[in-house]
Every structure is written in structure tokens, then in C-alpha cells.
From Swiss-Prot:
The gene is cca. Mg(2+) binds at D45, D47. It comes from Ligilactobacillus salivarius (strain UCC118) (Lactobacillus salivarius). It comes from the Bacteria. Homodimer. A single active site specifically recognizes both ATP and CTP and is responsible for their addition. CTP binds at G32, R35, R116, D159, R162, R165, R168. This is CCA-adding enzyme. It holds the Pfam family PolyA_pol.
Length: 404
């Protein structure tokens, strides 16, 4: 097969391939960028594989960066763009189901492609657009099939994360995991415990954000991978209930965790425990806790001015996306209009600050000043006083007399 219209991202890298070939070595585009080109999807990173060893690549190009020489990877800098070139390699035994004991550089493209995870990712393309397909990856792309390269158990023993990648690609591409690969995942699902949570986290979120998350989630459950993910082992029924939602589209990681928190019926501390076990950032945790409270307020028709002001429109819309999936969402435009009606969106928009209170209202720095600012802020938000400096100073003086 020949790719007639090679994407610009590849065209820009063609001089790299040509220079390697002129030096007497093979070089091909490989991996996800080739797969996505064949699927008509936008491509991101352009990866190159070559028969040249790292030291040979460094002799061919004047500007290189050692990004992973021990694994055969060198970055070539070309007109401000970096291209990672990885030497064809084979990998020996895997003691821990995630890292090879030994990486051996080879001159054979076939040997390199044999060690890749899935047939759809084991495709290469030369500088003329010709596709090298040694494992029927093109057929699987056409038929929407996720299949391990060669013996699936061997692939999953090499890196157990590949099991999560398989079901993630099922969601991302709306493909189905073929039977032998599926059975190998189910048989070896316990090996997922060997993998760092951070790596599983990435695949899990990509699964939920995929084109057909129900497909990926169904296979995630059926293969029993869920049993070996943090705090999911006893959540089969809750996870399965997500499959029953008719409108199931998530757009951000925050939406993913907010939906799960709602389905699991978690409160603040439980949400924090779940997300910490998945190694989420503190910012994500705070965001999801806030959004989860807003989901409940939407459900109870208790979205008030204070909720809009304290959370901001982004968190409100995240909550509403989950509310819509759950069947009780509001119109986004109505929410935006309500938010836009707020007199101020944050304390920074107040026409006075602590310095003004000191100089013009005689307020001394300290607890009283904080209380006065809080009171004035709340009065502005609720529309009880206008956000005008003179008016605010007068109100500050009154509050000072009353000691707030």
C-alpha cells in the first residue's frame, strides 16, 4: 500500500530519512503517526526508526540530543524541530513485567516491529509513502480490530500496561479487542499490579475520553482489569452502571473523575482518597470536590449566586456535563447567562482593597480588615451595594463603627 498524500508533518521530516539513507542505513516512520495517518486522524509526534545505531546517528547529524541512548533513542534537531530516532531493537526477558532486562540493537526492521504491542501500531512507512505491514495491521485497521502482535501473552508479559493500552485503543478508535488478545488480558489482568499507578492513570483517562468509552469500559470490566486498579475492586456494579447512560461524552479529566465520584456516591474525603490513590494532582482533587458539590446542587435545584461566584463557570459547566449524563442537566447557556449577571467574578474586581481601607476608612491591617473586605465582597455579589469606591468606603466606615 502507498500513502498518496503524505501529511506535512512527515514531509518536513523527509530530509532526515533521506540523510540517514544516504549514509547507508534504513529509516522509516513508525508507530502511532503512521496508524493515525491511515485512519485519517491528525498526527502528533513523528517517530522514526532506523538501522543506524545511536553513535552512527550522532555522526550523521551535527545537532543531536541524547534523550534515551540506552534504549537507542537520539533526538535530531532540524530547523527548530526535534525528531526522535530510535534504533531497531529487540528486548530480552522482562523480570518485572514493565522493563526489559536488556535492550539489544539490531539492523532488522522486522525484529523491531515484532516487539511492538499491537498490530495497528506495528506499521512502518518509508520515504515514498509505502507501508510496511508484517503483521496484518492494515487488515485490523480496516476491520476495527485490536490485536496483539504475535503471542499476546508474551507481549503482555513484556509490559503489562499493554493490556490497558489495548482496551484504551478500543475506546479511542471505537475498535474491538479480538478474542485471543481479550483472553490473554483476562488471564494476565493481575499483572497490572506490577505497573506504576501513574502509567495506568494516563491510559484510564484516555479510555474515558475516547470516541466510544462504553466499548473500552465494557472490555475493562469484562477482562477484569478493574480489579487491579486503585479502589475499583469492589466497584463493578457502579462502573457497569455507567454503560447504561444514553448520553455518555466526557471532554476533560476533571469530568471523568467527577462522573466517577458521583456514580460512586463519594463525599469530599472519599473523593480525595480515590484521587490520591490514582496519584492525581492537588488541583484536580480540589476541582473535582467542588464540581461534585455542584452536581448535587444542580440535581437539587439549589444553584445559587454564591455557588456561581465561589466556583466559577468552568466548574459549573463541568458539573452540568455530568448532570446531563445523569439525566438532570441544565442548559449551558442559561448557566453562562446566570454567571455573566454576577456584579463581580472575583475579589480582584472590587473597587477597593486593603490599602484603600487603611488610607480612606481608617481600618487597621488585621482580622477586622479581612472581615470588612469579606462583608463588602458578599454584599456586592448579592447586589446589595454597588461596586463603587466611594460607596464601598462609606460602607467600610459603618462596618468599622459596628465592629463588623
Amino acid at each position: 500500500m502507498i500513502v498518496e498524500n503524505i501529511p506535512d508533518e512527515f514531509k518536513k521530516a523527509l530530509p532526515i530519512l533521506e540523510k540517514i539513507r544516504e549514509a547507508g542505513f534504513e529509516a522509516y516512520f513508525v508507530g502511532g503517526s503512521v496508524r493515525d495517518t491511515l485512519l485519517g486522524l491528525p498526527i502528533h509526534d513523528v517517530d522514526i526508526a532506523s538501522s543506524a545505531y545511536p553513535e552512527e546517528i550522532k555522526q550523521i547529524f551535527s545537532k543531536t540530543v541524547d534523550t534515551g541512548v540506552e534504549h537507542g533513542t537520539v533526538m535530531v534537531l532540524d530547523h527548530g524541530t526535534g525528531y526522535e530516532i530510535t534504533t531497531f531493537r529487540t528486548e530480552s526477558t522482562y523480570q518485572d513485567y514493565r522493563r526489559p532486562d536488556k535492550v539489544e540493537f539490531v539492523r532488522s526492521l522486522e525484529e523491531d516491529l515484532k516487539r511492538r504491542d499491537l498490530t495497528i501500531n506495528a506499521l512502518a512507512m518509508d520515504d515514498k509513502g509505502k507501508i510496511i505491514d508484517l503483521f496484518d495491521g492494515l487488515k485490523d485497521l480496516k476491520n476495527g480490530i485490536i490485536r496483539a502482535v504475535g503471542n499476546p501473552e508474551e507481549r503482555f508479559h513484556e509490559d503489562a500496561l499493554r493490556m490497558m493500552r489495548a482496551v484504551r485503543f478500543g475506546s479511542q478508535l471505537d475498535f474491538k479487542v479480538e478474542l485471543d488478545t481479550f483472553n490473554a488480558i483476562k488471564k494476565n489482568s493481575h499483572l497490572l499490579e506490577k505497573i506504576a499507578i501513574e502509567r495506568i492513570h494516563v491510559e484510564w483517562v484516555k479510555l474515558l475520553l475516547g470516541k466510544n468509552p462504553k466499548q473500552g469500559l465494557q472490555e475493562f470490566l469484562d477482562t477484569e482489569l478493574y480489579k487491579y486498579c486503585p479502589l475499583f475492586a469492589d466497584k463493578y456494579a457502579e462502573l457497569k452502571s455507567i454503560l447504561e447512560f444514553s448520553d455518555f461524552k466526557l471532554n476533560t479529566e476533571e469530568e471523568c473523575w467527577t462522573l466517577l465520584s458521583d456514580v460512586f456516591k463519594l463525599k469530599d474525603t472519599d473523593i480525595s482518597n480515590l484521587l490520591r490513590s490514582w496519584k492525581s494532582s492537588n488541583n484536580i482533587i480540589k476541582y473535582v470536590i467542588a464540581a461534585s458539590l455542584c452536581v448535587q446542587k444542580i440535581k437539587d435545584s439549589k444553584l445559587d449566586i454564591e455557588t456561581y461566584y465561589q466556583n466559577g463557570i468552568e466548574i459549573i459547566l463541568t458539573a452540568n456535563q455530568i448532570a446531563k449524563i445523569r439525566g438532570f442537566g441544565m442548559d449551558d447557556n442559561e448557566l453562562k447567562n446566570n454567571y455573566d449577571k454576577l456584579p463581580i467574578k472575583s475579589r480582584k474586581e472590587m473597587k477597593i482593597n486593603g490599602k484603600d481601607l487603611v488610607q480612606e476608612a481608617g481600618v487597621k491591617p488585621g482580622k477586622i480588615m479581612g472581615e470588612i473586605l469579606n462583608k463588602l465582597e458578599k454584599e456586592i455579589v448579592f447586589g446589595n451595594i454597588i461596586n463603587d469606591k466611594e460607596i464601598l468606603i462609606e460602607n467600610a466606615k459603618k462596618l468599622l463603627e459596628e465592629k463588623v
